[in-house]
From Swiss-Prot:
It comes from Leptospira interrogans serogroup Icterohaemorrhagiae serovar Lai (strain 56601). One of its GO terms (molecular function) is protein methyltransferase activity. Its main location: cytoplasm. This is Ribosomal protein L11 methyltransferase. Belongs to the methyltransferase superfamily. PrmA family. It comes from the Bacteria. It catalyses: L-lysyl-[protein] + 3 S-adenosyl-L-methionine = N(6),N(6),N(6)-trimethyl-L-lysyl-[protein] + 3 S-adenosyl-L-homocysteine + 3 H(+).
Length: 300
């Protein structure tokens, strides 16, 4: 089987809308190319480019979506984007993202691609939790700023014996981190069946019990999410999805939230939504190249 690989470079300010568009039209998969190095960017280090790079994959029989993508970019970015495409075989598709995905440390965790575990596990520093991850078609390599922000904060929190809900789990990377940090129960859910399969695979790769890390399909209205009580809710999801589900978020039985996936331009609007609908206040904030981490508590 063949796939159509579309290589893109687009203005960063339209990246969130672009991913929402891809989710809406339905593509085989996509991922965002960001950092590819062991050491995170220093606070005063120059950002080389304001563009965001994507690779998008279409099924061989998909005759429409490449044109739709081009029309979307013309309408939103004008001439300020680069696009090229090619046919690739299944094996190339499965291997493509590995070129850009290497082990790296963020906070208390070292993210290790599953295909590098034989060499990388032995070099992980003492006191650092290794997270074996194969993202497959799911979001969550750990390279994206939003995932880095959440991992960095999770390392500062006491998660031992906590009950944690991870909505929009993607590859399951944040749930893996919670399990390695001693959480007693993690419910990882995602509306994308590919993510459910990916998170389940990564759980097993890390030898985490399915009784500790439960992976299921669903969203904020998932029965277990709504009916059970949680010590922490993690949602690394775009602002548009968070806004659309704010009432469901407010009804979840937890007083502690970690949100990421919100761009700086939408931060104040999201904080106002939280204040008016969820109640409580922000207790910790961190920004990374235009993406925001918001830790929110209903009780001060």
């Amino acid at each position: 089987m063949r796939y159509r690989e579309i290589i893109l470079s687009i203005p960063k300010e339209i990246a969130e809308n672009f991913t929402s568009f891809l989710d809406e039209v339905g593509v085989v998969g996509y991922y965002e190319i960001l950092f590819d190095r062991e050491v995170p960017r220093a606070p005063d280090e120059e950002i080389i480019s304001d563009d965001t790079k994507f690779r998008v994959y279409l099924a061989e029989e998909d005759k429409e979506n490449e044109t739709k993508i081009l029309i979307f970019l013309k309408a939103t970015a004008g001439e300020s984007f680069f696009l090229e495409s090619r046919w690739i075989e299944t094996k190339e598709y499965e291997e493509a993202y590995k070129e850009f995905y290497k082990p790296f440390i963020i906070g208390s965790y070292r993210v290790i691609p599953t295909w590098e575990k034989d060499t990388a596990l032995g070099t992980t520093p003492e006191g650092i939790f290794p997270l074996l991850v194969n993202p497959g078609l799911a979001f969550g390599t750990g390279h994206h700023e939003t995932t880095r922000l959440v991992l960095g904060r999770m390392g500062d929190l006491n998660l031992s014996a906590k009950r944690i809900a991870d909505v929009g789990t993607g590859s399951g990377i944040l749930s893996l981190a919670a399990a390695k940090s001693g959480a007693s129960l993690i419910l990882a859910i995602d509306v994308d069946p590919n993510s459910v399969r990916s998170a389940s695979f990564n759980r097993d790769e890390n030898e985490i019990s399915s009784e500790v890390l439960v992976v299921e399909e669903g969203g904020f209205d998932h029965k277990k999410i709504q009916e059970q009580t949680w010590d922490l809710l993690i949602a690394n999801i775009t602002f548009a999805v968070l806004k659309a589900n704010i009432q469901k978020i407010a009804s979840i039985k937890t007083d502690h939230f970690l949100f990421s996936g919100v761009i700086t331009e939408r931060k104040e609007e999201f904080l106002e939504l939280l204040k008016n609908t969820v109640g409580g206040e922000g207790v910790f904030f961190r920004e990374d190249t235009g993406w925001e981490l918001i830790e929110w508590k209903r009780k001060g």
